């Protein structure tokens, strides 16, 4: 064997001279680079790979046809390689390459042996096909084919011929092995896990680089609607829990136990993220490097083709070689681009998992006060999305610079010193852009802060939508939100202008660099090299231009990442209980025994507490002991700090002095029920069980003890009833009962109840206390009796407490001890006039109720038995001891996606844009695209003229016009960007937000039964963010790229009819591809947006109930749930990104075919000049880049338009459900009398389109017939869930009556309220809701009180003084302008704030009427007589005089003022309607009576309808005629009582009359309250 046929093979070459037509490499070059170096590299990489796989478990069955085939072929290939090695030793001495031949065969044989071993381990212990084998076999296969051709052409003997035949056989073996190795092993796994269920988790490099693994998903999306639950899982490497575990290791200074440690040990968040995802971050580097090389090869291809056409002798082999080179280059570009983006997108979604999990975990570590100010929902949504958008072109930073350096060197070899022109311009633009980028971060932070405020405001409003509508604040809140939106858009102006500047700077190098370079070198550069120079400049400027455009998003992303880091650096709550010994202070009290040490639940020693470090003390000098297994009650006046003390024991409030010692039993779970019940948006049963183990008997026990059985039997879906966002679909009492039941169901050894009885009716309160806290109650009967703490205003139960703690108004402990001691020491407790336990216990605690109560309520013993039987029948216990609820399942949101026409979405988005602006935008884009593409054709004309015998124009002419075209293109690009950002984006964004939020504020409450808070928040967070940020950028990019693409296609068609003949085929192929793509991608876009709503809802739930969850040790369960929701949201988003790059791969393949067609055309037909070939290939070089950019921008645009589609669908859905918006607007003075009439009205919470059955559970109100006279004060009573709040909602137009309801069935002052616009109705009727709403953190006291901003400071101060709130505000730095912190207010103070807000509304209304009317209307202050003030003072002094002298509670007598009695009959005094929905549920009796006086004086002539559970106003303050009896004041505040039960009026009359009726239901309620002579 000598292969000595050609003497040129002995040289390095690389091109052989004088042999094989000159179209081949030398044999020496091939032996070195084809047969030696690649196998040697494989040997180096294979050894550590085998070592890493050796210890891994076997996960794939090796007894299969695939494994056998690979091993057999591997051994056959090894035998062949050994044979070739032996034959190589037979070479002649004259053959100078025999040594190189031998070394090549030794290395190749060794690599073949090692490949068999690698194949074994890769097959059995790796989920994917072997990447190292895929790359090695694929690369060496192409090299071996080329080498095999050379060997065949170099055969010089029979031995050479035999050698070549064996070598050909090894090539065939390697080809089959490459195919077998690339096959998936999915069906051969020993154990199937999430990786085997993923689409790409078991695929190899070939499948990944061609995206063939998406074929099943694409076909499925094309043929059928996609469902979220049908999407495949992500592979193990992208599991959230796995990623977060690694992320936590690198964020020790931010999260976990070391949170809050020394900041010097912290890594910047960007570094921590890079360290966590180091391998995913590095994987895209190799394909990106390959892409750089292939991209630069395009310039050499253009040079080779133009050189071939310029040559006189054109060899056919060279033409075929150019065609082959074109195939290799463009196939390589397509594959490397796909692999690069695949790995980079995986990194981005891994980063999203880490950041989202980190933000959620940090949220669980923060205090309630910190969470209220942080508004972290924006971080999880908007900021993370901007971080990912900024990191999208992360690898372009280094890749573009490397490519720029290489291309600059190539330009230097051709242009010498002139290469500095394009490079200098590029550097100058880069410096300018860096300067711009320095300012983007600051502007971006400002914008994000305003976005955060707006989203937090909307989230707060949506969480309290019922209260907003009841309070008539919908229009006011709408104005506030729209004002915040305008502020946000103004804040975005700086970022938008800088983005325009950055994008304009990015266009400068690409458009101006060719002009100045050709102007300087046109006389010295050969015309045939012009296209090569232009191509090289394009390779220099195009990636840098893309990089420049990425600077603004990158800086914005880094600014958002900095905001996230700031959030992660917040000080965590310092929990003083837990399993961490360093955080736990156990009780050590002298030499006491361990049993005695742990007989305490809590002990506070000289404790002082404050909400935040810089805030004043809310509790001070606290010394108390809460014993284990004892019942401790905490009482005190409104604002004394009862709730604060509960939070202090939980560790939620900062301890500034003293110690809090925690007993052993309180280290674990603590069941905490706050004043505002925390409920997640799930079923009632799920809220009660709440991650505890299911126990049927315990479940039934707690719902009976809590009184929930009565309500469950009357709800349509029973246990399976959805509670809605924040319990929207339930009454306040029902929400509280569920929270109580949850605490009872838990296995906690310590239970803390914060004012849980205040929102319950008298009978329910009595039932709850007797069955839960009483001597025979549930908590005292349990064998492991827990420590129970109850904060309450219901002081009648104090005699039954084991220990009593009394707080003073100054925030310290006034007294504490047992009842017997405190009731006789002359202190605060004795002044309450509560009767002793011997008088209370027989009737309250032992279940001896009054006969009138037992006989006249629907829930008798037999009813309760039937309720219990119904309850037990509803529950079906499955074999795994989990309960399921029979009956209709709650219908959740549908995950089937349908997409309406895309054009409709564009019309909806652009409807607010003027026609002039839209036409100008399109015209400027067309100008940009045409003048971008046409100069390349202009170069073709220049070359033709330059190569002709008689030139028509000088070079200056051609360069001048060439420069003019580029200048016009730059101007068109700038105008396109400016118009899109200003005239389109700002106008459309403002219009979309305004119309949709206004529609939601007008929507009926039934809408929020089907759409939860998280979903709606997602619309105004993620979707609006896409509309504001991503949509204008992607719209600009796509329209410009589309204009360029069409212009290039037109220019190419004009230059060659042959190329135009390919267009129909290319268009048909692209149409089919895009149609297949859109069917799937549009569904995935909607799913990706919708899948985030549950994640955001879960996040909002945790933020709202953080104290409850932290106390119950449930954060781990919620973290796991967050991980599940995060993974679900990742699936459609990740698959969408992959589908987008599948489309890019197909477009690159189409470009490849066009390039092959052009090269084939010019090399084979040879009737096209150099100009056509050069211009065509330059355009194709740019065309591929433009298509890639167009694909990305189109994908982003479609994603953004998916958000527009969702917003459009939401608007249409809301508008279709909204009623009453076409009604009338009555005169400003309406209602002037307050005459209310209801005639046979029934109503349901189901929308009017839903089927409603006429059953107890289906109707909220049943056949209500009611007439309320002007000026009448009506109290609505009844147990929780009886329909009291529903009646208020009906009067406000928020609850829809049945369609069968007749005309004029609901009238106020003679007008049917259904004919009045609902927004107007809520504004005209003043209402005070049970729960107070506040603006987000940062809003001042005055802004929260005077939402309209129409009152003076003196008016606001006057009202606050009347409500005894001014002293609280006066203590704040800044007074009314200081930031309000609602979490520092007690529930009673919050309710007083609501009353103050209503008083201000009434005064503003009176002022507006006076200004609009010529009638002089006396003001409230004029109607308030001096005698009333004196009488009020007398009442209070009388009360103080008898304190401590009577065994009855001292009640100030309410005497109505003369104005109140006469105002309703005066024509010059306008009345109205005031609705009070349990506004006094958290007030003590003295505070309640004081504010009834204020309401009476502030609202003269008003018809007042009040829902109340507080019946103390009806109890006489003198000696009762018999024990347990109650009477009403003859001249009291209320002159009419209505009792509701099951949605029906069961009693109606004057309080005195009803109390004197022996079987009165109202009398039964009052007797329940009278047994303690105190409010219930």
Curated annotation (Swiss-Prot):
Entry annotated with the keyword Aminoacyl-tRNA synthetase: no
Domain ABC transporter: 602-834, 1236-1567
Molecular function terms from GO: ABC-type transporter activity; ATP binding; ATP hydrolysis activity
Other noteworthy facts: Gene clusters encoding host-selective toxins (HSTs) are localized on conditionally dispensable chromosomes (CDCs), also called supernumerary chromosomes, where they are present in multiple copies. The CDCs are not essential for saprophytic growth but controls host-selective pathogenicity.
Transmembrane feature ranges: 27-47, 72-92, 99-119, 267-287, 289-309, 321-341, 387-407, 417-437, 500-520, 525-545, 915-935, 957-977, 981-1001, 1035-1054, 1060-1078, 1142-1162, 1171-1191
Binding site for ATP: 636-643, 1278-1285
Protein's job: ABC transporter that may provide the dual role AAL-toxin export and self-protection by allowing the fungus to evade the harmful effect of its own AAL-toxin production.
Species whose genome carries this gene: Alternaria alternata
Protein name as it appears in the record: ABC transporter ALT5
CDD domains per record: ABC_6TM_ABCC_D1 (cd18579), ABC_6TM_ABCC_D2 (cd18580)
Annotated family: Belongs to the ABC transporter superfamily. ABCC family. Conjugate transporter (TC 3.A.1.208) subfamily.
Main location: membrane
Residue ranges occupied by any ABC transmembrane type-1 domain in the UniProt entry: 289-556, 919-1199
Compartments in which it is found: Cell membrane
């Amino acid at each position: 064997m000598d292969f000595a046929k050609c003497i040129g093979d002995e040289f390095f070459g690389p091109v052989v001279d004088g042999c094989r037509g000159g179209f081949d490499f030398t044999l020496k070059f091939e032996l070195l680079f084809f047969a030696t170096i690649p196998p040697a590299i494989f040997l180096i990489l294979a050894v550590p790979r085998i070592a890493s796989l050796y210890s891994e478990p076997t996960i794939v069955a090796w007894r299969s046809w695939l494994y056998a085939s690979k091993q057999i072929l591997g051994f056959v290939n090894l035998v062949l390689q050994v044979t070739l090695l032996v034959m190589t030793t037979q070479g002649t001495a004259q053959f100078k390459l025999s040594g190189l031949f031998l070394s090549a065969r030794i290395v190749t044989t060794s690599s073949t042996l090692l490949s068999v071993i690698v194949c074994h381990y890769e097959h059995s212990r790796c989920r994917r096909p072997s990447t190292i084998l895929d790359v090695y076999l694929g690369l060496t296969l192409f090299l071996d084919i080329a080498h095999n051709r050379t060997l065949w052409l170099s055969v010089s003997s029979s031995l050479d011929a035999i050698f070549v035949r064996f070598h050909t056989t090894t090539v065939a073996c390697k080809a089959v092995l490459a195919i077998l190795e690339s096959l998936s092993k999915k069906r051969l796994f020993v154990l199937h896990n999430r990786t085997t269920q993923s689409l790409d988790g078991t695929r190899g490099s070939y499948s990944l680089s061609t995206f063939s693994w998406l074929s099943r998903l694409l076909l499925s999306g094309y043929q059928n609607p996609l469902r979220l639950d049908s999407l495949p899982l992500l592979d193990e490497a992208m599991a959230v829990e796995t990623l977060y575990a690694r992320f936590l290791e690198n964020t020790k200074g931010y999260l976990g136990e070391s949170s809050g440690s020394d900041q010097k040990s912290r890594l910047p968040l960007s570094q921590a993220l890079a360290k966590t995802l180091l391998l995913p971050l590095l994987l895209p580097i190799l394909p990106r490097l390959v892409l750089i090389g292939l991209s630069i090869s395009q310039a050499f291809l253009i040079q080779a083709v133009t050189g071939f056409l310029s040559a006189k002798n054109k060899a056919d082999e060279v033409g075929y070689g150019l065609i082959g080179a074109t195939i290799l280059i463009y196939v390589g570009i397509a594959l490397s681009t796909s692999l690069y983006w695949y790995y980079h997108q995986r990194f981005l979604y891994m980063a999203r998992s880490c950041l989202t999990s980190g933000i959620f975990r940090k949220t669980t570590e923060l205090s309630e006060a910190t969470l209220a100010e942080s508004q972290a929902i924006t971080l999880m949504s908007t900021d993370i999305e901007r971080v990912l958008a900024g990191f999208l072109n992360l690898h372009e930073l280094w890749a573009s610079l490397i490519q720029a350096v290489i291309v600059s060197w190539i330009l230097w070899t051709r242009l010498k010193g002139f290469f500095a022109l394009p490079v200098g311009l590029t550097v100058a633009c880069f410096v300018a852009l860096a300067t711009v980028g320095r300012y983007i971060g600051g502007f971006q932070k400002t914008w994000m802060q305003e976005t955060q405020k707006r989203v937090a405001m909307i989230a707060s409003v949506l969480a309290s939508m019922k209260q907003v509508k009841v309070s008539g604040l919908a229009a006011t809140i709408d104005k506030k939100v729209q004002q915040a939106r305008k502020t946000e858009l103004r804040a975005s102006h700086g970022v938008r202008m800088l983005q325009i500047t950055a994008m304009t700077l990015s266009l400068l190098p690409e458009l101006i660099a060719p002009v100045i370079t050709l102007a300087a070198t046109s006389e010295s550069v050969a015309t045939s090299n012009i296209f090569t120079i232009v191509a090289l400049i394009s390779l220099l400027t195009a990636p840098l231009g893309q990089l420049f455009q990425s600077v603004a998003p990158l800086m914005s992303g880094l600014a958002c990442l900095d905001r996230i880091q700031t959030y992660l650096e917040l000080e965590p709550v310092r929990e003083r209980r837990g399993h961490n010994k360093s955080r736990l202070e156990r009780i050590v009290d002298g030499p006491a025994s361990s049993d005695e040490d742990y007989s305490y639940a809590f002990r506070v020693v000289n404790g002082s507490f404050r909400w935040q470090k810089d805030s004043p003390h809310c509790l001070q000098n606290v010394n108390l002991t809460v014993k284990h297994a004892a019942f401790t009650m905490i009482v005190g006046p409104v604002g004394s700090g009862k709730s604060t003390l509960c939070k202090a024991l939980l560790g939620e409030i900062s301890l500034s002095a003293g110690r809090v010692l925690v007993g052993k039993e309180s280290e674990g779970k603590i069941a905490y029920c706050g004043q505002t019940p925390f409920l997640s948006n799930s079923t009632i049963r799920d809220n009660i069980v709440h991650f505890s183990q299911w126990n049927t008997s315990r479940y039934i026990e707690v719902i009976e003890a809590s009184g929930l059985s009565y309500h469950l039997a009357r709800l349509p879906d029973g246990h399976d009833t959805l509670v809605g966002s924040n319990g929207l679909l339930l009454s306040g009492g029902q929400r509280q009962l569920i929270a109580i039941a949850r605490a009872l169901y838990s296995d906690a050894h310590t239970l803390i109840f914060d004012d849980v009885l205040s929102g319950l009716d008298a009978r329910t309160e009595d039932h709850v206390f007797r069955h839960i806290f009483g001597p025979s109650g549930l908590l005292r009967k349990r064998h492991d009796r827990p420590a129970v703490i109850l904060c309450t205003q219901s002081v009648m139960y104090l005699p039954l407490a084991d220990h009593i703690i009394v707080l003073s108004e100054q925030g310290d402990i006034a007294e504490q001890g047992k009842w017997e001691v405190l009731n006789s020491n002359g202190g605060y407790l004795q002044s309450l006039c509560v009767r002793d336990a011997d008088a209370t216990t027989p009737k309250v605690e032992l279940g001896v109720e009054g006969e009138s109560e037992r006989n006249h309520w629907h829930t008798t013993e037999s009813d309760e038995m039937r309720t219990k039987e119904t309850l037990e029948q509803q529950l079906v216990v499955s074999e795994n001891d989990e309960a399921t609820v029979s009956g209709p399942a709650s219908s959740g949101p549908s995950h089937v996606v349908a997409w309406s026409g895309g054009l409709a979405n564009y019309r909806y988005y652009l409807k607010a844009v003027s026609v002039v602006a839209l036409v100008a935008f399109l015209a400027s884009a067309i100008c940009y695209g045409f003048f971008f593409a046409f100069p390349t054709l202009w170069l073709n004309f220049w070359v033709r003229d330059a190569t002709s015998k008689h030139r028509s124009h000088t070079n200056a002419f051609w360069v001048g016009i060439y420069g003019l075209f580029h200048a016009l293109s730059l101007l068109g690009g700038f105008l396109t960007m400016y118009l899109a950002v200003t005239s389109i984006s700002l106008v459309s964004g403002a219009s979309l937000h305004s119309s949709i939020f206004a529609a939601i504020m007008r929507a009926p409450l039934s809408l929020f039964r089907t759409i939860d808070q998280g979903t709606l928040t997602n619309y105004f967070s993620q979707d609006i963010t896409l509309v504001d940020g991503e949509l204008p950028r992607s719209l600009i990019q796509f329209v410009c790229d589309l204009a360029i693409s069409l212009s290039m296609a037109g220019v190419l068609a004009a230059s060659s009819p042959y190329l135009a003949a390919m267009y129909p085929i290319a268009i048909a192929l692209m149409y089919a591809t895009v149609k297949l793509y859109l069917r799937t991608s549009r569904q995935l876009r909607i799913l990706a947006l919708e899948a985030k709503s549950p994640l955001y809802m879960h996040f909002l739930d945790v933020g709202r109930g953080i104290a409850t969850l932290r106390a119950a040790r449930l954060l781990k369960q919620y973290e796991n749930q967050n991980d599940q929701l995060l993974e679900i949201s990742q699936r459609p988003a990740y698959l969408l990104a992959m589908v987008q790059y599948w489309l890019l791969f197909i477009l690159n393949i189409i470009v490849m075919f066009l390039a092959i067609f052009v090269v084939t055309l010019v090399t084979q037909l040879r009737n096209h000049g150099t100009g056509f070939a050069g211009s065509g290939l330059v355009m194709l070089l740019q065309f591929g880049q433009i298509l890639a950019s167009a694909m990305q921008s189109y994908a982003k645009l479609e994603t953004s338009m998916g958000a527009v589609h969702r917003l459009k669908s939401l608007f249409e859905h809301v508008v279709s459900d909204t009623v009453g918006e076409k009604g009338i607007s009555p005169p400003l003075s309406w209602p002037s009398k307050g005459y209310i009439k209801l005639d046979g009205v029934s109503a349901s919470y189901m929308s009017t389109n839903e089927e409603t059955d006429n059953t107890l559970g289906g109707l909220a109100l049943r056949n209500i017939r009611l007439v309320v006279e002007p000026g009448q004060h009506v109290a609505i009573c009844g147990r929780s869930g009886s329909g009291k709040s529903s009646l208020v909602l009906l009067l406000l137009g928020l609850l829809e009556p049945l369609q069968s309801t007749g005309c004029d069935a609901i009238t106020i002052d003679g007008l049917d309220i259904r004919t009045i616009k609902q927004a107007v109705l809520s504004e005209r009727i003043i209402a005070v809701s049970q729960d107070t709403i506040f603006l987000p953190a940062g809003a001042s006291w005055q802004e929260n009180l005077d939402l309209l901003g129409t009152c003076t400071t003196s008016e606001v101060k006057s009202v606050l003084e009347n409500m005894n709130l001014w002293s609280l505000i006066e203590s704040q730095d800044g007074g009314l302008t200081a930031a309000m912190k609602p979490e520092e207010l007690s529930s009673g103070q919050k309710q007083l704030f609501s009353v103050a807000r209503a008083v201000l509304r009434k005064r503003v209304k009176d002022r507006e009427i006076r200004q609009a009317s010529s009638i002089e209307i006396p003001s409230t202050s004029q109607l308030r007589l001096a005698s009333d003030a004196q009488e009020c003072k007398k009442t209070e002094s009388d009360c103080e005089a008898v304190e401590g002298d009577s065994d009855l509670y001292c009640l100030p007598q309410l005497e109505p003022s003369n104005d109140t009695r006469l105002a309703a009959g005066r024509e010059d005094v306008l009345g109205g309607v005031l609705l009070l929905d349990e506004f006094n549920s958290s007030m003590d009796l003295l505070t309640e009576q004081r504010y009834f006086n204020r309401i009476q004086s502030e609202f003269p002539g008003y018809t007042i309808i009040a829902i109340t559970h507080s019946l103390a106003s009806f109890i006489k303050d003198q000696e009762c005629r018999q024990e347990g009896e109650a009477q009403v004041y003859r001249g009291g505040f209320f002159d009419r009582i209505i009792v509701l039960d099951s949605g029906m009026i069961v009693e109606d009359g004057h309080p005195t009359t009803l109390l004197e009726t022996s079987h009165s239901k109202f009398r039964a309620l009052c007797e329940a309250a009278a047994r303690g002579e105190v409010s219930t």
